[in-house]
């Protein structure tokens, strides 16, 4: 790891670098066998020079200001890199977009790498907020934690429910790559709460609107399958038709009171299924 000269001088001035457990000076010469202690936060250390982002695909910008960019993520695209380290992700595309606009310079000292404020599963499409600076990321993450950001989903499900609206309360446990659902509280299971409204009924499928009170692993997919109405195309959770990508979209977003220009704005994108 490397430490820039300016950071090193600041660390010495603030007594964050010691030689043989004693404060060092700017002109001190090291001797063989000296012990050097660094009391530095991780962000002061650079493991390598940040590479410039590459163009892996375009993004669909729904809204943008000096702090936030709101994009419509397509199904099939990862929100961020997984354990495989895949480069074509929504985060990489956003960073390249801002790099082209000269709003992001990865090689500038202490530059902030634009980041998403929340994520969607790979095969879920819809609205995702991304922050252009650290302040915006902190404020938006706080707003999400305080439930000041409301996401509404739309899904195409197998079957036609007899009810028009339904409050769903169950319990979910993540087991490897699948969510297990229980009707009552059990060890290892977490409460999963959501509201479902039928928007349209066809002969073999329906379109429903879903609002989550909690954000559990595969909550919508597992809960709808638990009710007997799996998402169309969702083989993992019981769909009996042909194998294809399931139909789920975070199509509506409401921003509450937050100290950013995007405050108190609503956004809706069209549904393609």
Give the role of each language-model region.
Residues 1-273:
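RNA pseudouridine synthases
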């Amino acid at each position: 790891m490397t430490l820039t000269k300016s950071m090193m001088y600041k660390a010495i001035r603030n007594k964050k670098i010691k030689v043989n457990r004693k404060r060092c000076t700017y002109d001190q010469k090291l001797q063989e066998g000296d012990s050097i202690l660094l009391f530095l936060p991780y962000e002061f250390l650079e493991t390598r020079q940040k590479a410039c982002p590459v163009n892996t695909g375009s993004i669909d910008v729904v809204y943008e200001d000096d702090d936030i960019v709101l994009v419509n993520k397509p199904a099939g695209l990862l929100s961020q890199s997984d354990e495989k380290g895949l480069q074509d992700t929504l985060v990489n595309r956003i960073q390249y977009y801002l790099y082209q606009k000269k709003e992001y310079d990865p090689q500038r000292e202490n530059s902030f790498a634009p980041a998403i404020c929340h994520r969607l599963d790979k095969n879920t499409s819809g609205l995702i907020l991304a922050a252009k600076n650290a302040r915006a990321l902190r404020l938006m993450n706080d707003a999400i934690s305080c439930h000041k950001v409301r996401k509404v989903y739309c899904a195409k499900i197998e079957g036609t429910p007899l009810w028009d609206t339904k409050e769903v309360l169950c319990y979910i446990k993540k087991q490897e790559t699948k969510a297990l659902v229980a009707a009552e509280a059990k060890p290892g299971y977490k409460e999963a709460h959501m509201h479902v409204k039928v928007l349209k009924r066809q002969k073999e499928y329906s379109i429903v609107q879903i609002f989550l009170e909690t954000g559990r692993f595969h909550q919508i997919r597992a809960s709808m399958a638990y009710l007997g109405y799996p998402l169309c195309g969702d083989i993992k959770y019981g769909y009996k038709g042909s194998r294809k990508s399931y139909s789920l979209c975070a199509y509506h977003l409401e921003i509450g009171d937050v100290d950013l220009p995007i405050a108190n704005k609503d956004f809706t994108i069209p549904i393609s299924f």
